[in-house]
């Protein structure tokens, strides 16, 4: 029997009986609910800069997070794609996590506010996010960024998108080297379910029905789900996946996505990729993001390890 640690158990009890995202009355209400849950005063030590990236898929709002102590220095770049089921999430609701990464790594974290479903569906936000990634690489000097070697990071469906960014960068020859990927509970397959969907059918925080609703909203076409972008675990070719850089995958033991995260890590390992899979015992989905959970000892240890792996490729960062 998998159990939650005291911090996660307390939060699970607090939300028990409350409507899940798919029960709130539509994507707009779900978005508002997450924004309220994650209401956060901007950190005093982190500077933010909001820019607009024009282009075929824009304009896209992009927020750059960096330590105020390093604001005048050229900084390495982490490109972060956020979770929220492709229907929720913003630079505001994810600020507490992204600020932490900027603080711990000494890097600039680039956060695209891609268009959420149902306003745009698969694959538009993937193309939109890649457009931002390529723009930041080509215009890095304008924003005091060091872009020769960069990292990708993302959580949940944002991890799904980070995998897509890597795939697209290889196929389209992004003029930069991606040297590290950091993933939290990534979605890696959308056309089938692994056993943990049944094990954690009722959550907490991410029940099976919510995940089903998110996939149906973002990828309504079932044929689209059986593609490399939508289901990299089962459809991304070996010759592409084998070119992935060192990748670390953090998983929660109480999460419907845990099994597909393990399977993706094992597939990377089988192809010779330097891939690490780490399960955080007693944690639920989004334990490094949710304000009520992220100060727990396990979440803090995971964030410390994530930052360590990121700093490893940025030898000149703080």
Curated annotation (Swiss-Prot):
GO molecular function: hydrolase activity
Entry annotated with the keyword Hydrolase: yes
S-S pairs: none
Keywords: Hydrolase
Its EC number(s): 3.1.1.-
Keyword Repressor: no
Gene null: resulting phenotype: Does not affect tolerance to 2-benzoxazolinone (BOA).
A Pfam family per the record: Abhydrolase_3
Inducing stimuli: Expression is induced in response to 2-benzoxasolinone (BOA) exposure.
Top EC group: hydrolase
InterPro entries: AB_hydrolase_3 (IPR013094), AB_hydrolase_fold (IPR029058), GDXG_lipolytic_enzyme (IPR050300)
Catalytic residues, chain numbering: 156, 255, 285
Protein function: Esterase; part of the Fusarium detoxification of benzoxazolinone cluster 2 (FDB2) involved in the degradation of benzoxazolinones produced by the host plant. Maize, wheat, and rye produce the 2 benzoxazinone phytoanticipins 2,4-dihy-droxy-7-methoxy-1,4-benzoxazin-3-one (DIMBOA) and 2,4-dihydroxy-1,4-benzoxazin-3-one (DIBOA) that, due to their inherent instability once released, spontaneously degrade to the more stable corresponding benzoxazolinones, 6-methoxy-2-benzoxazolinone (MBOA) and 2-benzoxazolinone (BOA), respectively.
Family assignment from sequence similarity: Belongs to the AB hydrolase 3 family.
Leftover remarks: Fusarium verticillioides possesses 2 unlinked loci, FDB1 and FDB2, necessary for detoxification of antimicrobial compounds produced by maize, including 2-benzoxazolinone (BOA). The FDB2 cluster arose as a duplication of the FDB1 cluster with rearrangement and expansion by incorporating additional genes.
Protein name: Esterase FVEG_12639
Species of origin: Gibberella moniliformis (strain M3125 / FGSC 7600) (Maize ear and stalk rot fungus)
Species classification: Eukaryota, Fungi, Dikarya, Ascomycota, Pezizomycotina
